[in-house]
Amino acid sequence: TSAEVPATAQGVTHALEGTQ
């Protein structure tokens, strides 16, 4: 769904931030 796309993108961004 449309709501699933932004949710996944936010999750990836948060994961990348945690890695850095």
UniProtKB/Swiss-Prot annotation:
Main location (coarse class): mitochondrion
Superkingdom field? Eukaryota
**What keywords sit in the KW lines?**
ATP synthesis, CF(1), Hydrogen ion transport, Ion transport, Membrane, Mitochondrion, Mitochondrion inner membrane, Transport
Q: Name one GO cellular component term.
A: mitochondrial inner membrane
Renumbered residue ranges of the record's region Disordered: 1-20
Cell location: Mitochondrion; Mitochondrion inner membrane
Q: Name one GO biological process term.
A: proton transmembrane transport
Q: How does it assemble?
A: F-type ATPases have 2 components, CF(1) - the catalytic core - and CF(0) - the membrane proton channel. CF(1) has five subunits: alpha(3), beta(3), gamma(1), delta(1), epsilon(1). CF(0) has three main subunits: a, b and c.
Instruction: Give the similarity note.
Output: Belongs to the ATPase epsilon chain family.
Q: What does this protein do?
A: Mitochondrial membrane ATP synthase (F(1)F(0) ATP synthase or Complex V) produces ATP from ADP in the presence of a proton gradient across the membrane which is generated by electron transport complexes of the respiratory chain. F-type ATPases consist of two structural domains, F(1) - containing the extramembraneous catalytic core, and F(0) - containing the membrane proton channel, linked together by a central stalk and a peripheral stalk. During catalysis, ATP turnover in the catalytic domain of F(1) is coupled via a rotary mechanism of the central stalk subunits to proton translocation.
Name assigned to this protein: ATP synthase subunit delta', mitochondrial
Q: Which organism is it from?
A: Spinacia oleracea
